[in-house]
Regions:
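Leucine-rich repeat
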Residues: 70-71, 92-93, 124-125, 135, ...
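Catalytic core of nucleotide-activated saccharide and alditol-phosphate transferases
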Residues: 115-116, 121-125
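Conserved positional slot within leucine-rich repeat
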Residues: 63, 74, 85-86, 96, ...
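N-terminal capping/linker segments that flank leucine-rich repeat
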Residues: 1-83, 91-104, 112-116, 130-133, ...
């Protein structure tokens, strides 16, 4: 684990180069210990692809691929971070988001060429988002031991995409910011979106149990008719029941397609926004 501490006060210009050099040395050393030889020392690949800095040497964003080295992430070290992401983070045991009012995007994903069945993040069972008041996007893919996610305090969230993560419970905030919600292969059988007053897109793919009830709250027929709803089932039949203070027998514009709207609209676009 490399503990990277940034000074609270803005550093001098001469210190910025020292910070940058230190960050790069840490990640180059991590890559060497992993046996990676695709980089060349002295290249600016860390600045362009992995880490971004602001004018004062603070880390603005980070994307990790170290599979064996990193076991815990403590984001309170990074006082001005805007996004954090990890792929192939199979040994991660904890992610402490701390009180990060600047964090906007968070994602966990599988590594390149890896399948969702390879036991990604086997030790990670909790992520606390409560201190991230400006969080706008969450993308979580193939985290098999997280059973509960609480987003109830994240009232500025715009996109939620949770894939191949067998949740038992998902708590949503009271907000008019959330526009897109996508979920697949969870164990949730009841989902309350009644407090998400401005939601526009919902994507649901094969869940276990195969019947999911989604509460839309006090929505009018006109509001519901303008929803973009995608229900897709691959190996098993998926039944989604929508209720809005009454049972809705037929929701206009529901699309049953071969393909998952959530991955296309929520996943890839979200990752492009982050990196």
């Amino acid at each position: 684990i490399y503990n990277i501490t940034v000074k609270k006060q803005a550093p001098k210009k001469s210190e910025i180069k020292q910070f940058t050099k230190f960050y790069k040395e840490c990640f180059i050393k991590s890559s060497k210990e992993m046996g990676n030889d695709w980089y060349a020392e002295g290249d600016d690949f860390l600045h362009d692809k992995w880490i971004e800095w602001d004018d004062y040497g603070y880390i603005r964003g980070m994307s990790l691929e170290a599979k064996e080295i990193l076991t815990e992430i403590n984001l309170p070290w990074f006082k001005k971070i805007q996004y954090f992401g990890s792929v192939t983070g199979n040994n991660l045991k904890s992610i402490d988001l701390g009180n990060n009012p600047t964090l906007k995007y968070f994602f966990l994903d599988v590594g390149y060429g890896e399948s969702a069945e390879e036991g990604n993040y086997p030790y990670l069972n909790k992520i606390d988002f409560s201190g991230c008041q400006n969080l706008e996007g969450v993308y979580i893919n193939s985290v098999f031991n997280i059973k509960q996610i609480d987003l109830s305090n994240n009232r500025k969230i715009k996109t939620v995409n949770i894939s191949h993560t067998p949740l038992d419970e998902l708590k949503m905030p009271k907000t008019d910011c959330l526009k897109e919600f996508y979920m697949n292969w969870s164990r949730i059988n009841e989902l309350d979106l009644s407090n998400c007053t401005n939601i526009q897109k919902i994507g649901i793919i094969g869940c276990n149990p195969q019947s999911v009830t989604i509460s839309l709250g006090n929505k009018t027929d006109k509001e519901i008719s303008e929803f973009d709803i995608d229900v897709y089932s691959a190996d098993v039949e998926t039944s989604v029941r929508f209720v809005a203070n009454r049972e809705i027998s037929e929701v206009p514009k529901v699309r049953y397609e071969y393909g998952y709207l959530g991955y296309i609209d929520g996943g890839l676009d979200f990752l492009r926004n982050c990196i």
